[in-house]
Amino acid sequence: MPRRREVPKRVVLPDPKYKEEVIAKFANVMMRDGKKSTAEKIVYGALEMVAERSKSDALEIFRKAIDNVRPVVEVKSRRVGGATYQVPVEIRSDRRMALAMRWLRDSARKRNEKSMGNRLAAEILEAAENRGNAVRKREETHRMAEANKAFAHFRW
């Protein structure tokens, strides 16, 4: 974090196929070793599979999945008088989106399907139905915040 001035946010250009910033951002999250075209192929393939399996708009299902995974509160560690407390704090909207995408990617990577496209498609479909590991991760985060609600007055 620079001290002098705030660093401007980079503008993410919409993806070429769906003309959506969300998809472009997700492709960037999926990218490994700077291989953007590979990441885009995986994301587009997964979205096609989602459309095939659900017989409806893949983009809508993807948005619903992201919304279901997006957390509202998280806990941050705060030292107060020698003790470390897990203080629940509300999450900024851009961080909510970033966390949701990261959790979706990580849960897809942990699955056992053959290709990454299959894994991602399955995870997106489950997340859209409020199931799956990514949704479980959000629930866990909310549970932690709820359990530590007593320390909310330590917020900074």
UniProtKB/Swiss-Prot annotation:
Keywords: Ribonucleoprotein, Ribosomal protein, RNA-binding, rRNA-binding, tRNA-binding
Ion transport listed as a keyword: no
Domain of life of the organism encoding this protein: Bacteria
A single MF term (Gene Ontology): structural constituent of ribosome
Entries under Gene3D superfamilies matching the protein: Ribosomal protein S7 domain
Annotated Gene Ontology cellular component terms: small ribosomal subunit
Gene Ontology BP annotations: translation
Residue ranges crossing the lipid bilayer per the database entry: none
Family: Belongs to the universal ribosomal protein uS7 family.
Described function: One of the primary rRNA binding proteins, it binds directly to 16S rRNA where it nucleates assembly of the head domain of the 30S subunit. Is located at the subunit interface close to the decoding center, probably blocks exit of the E-site tRNA.
Quaternary structure and partners: Part of the 30S ribosomal subunit. Contacts proteins S9 and S11.
Record protein name field: Small ribosomal subunit protein uS7
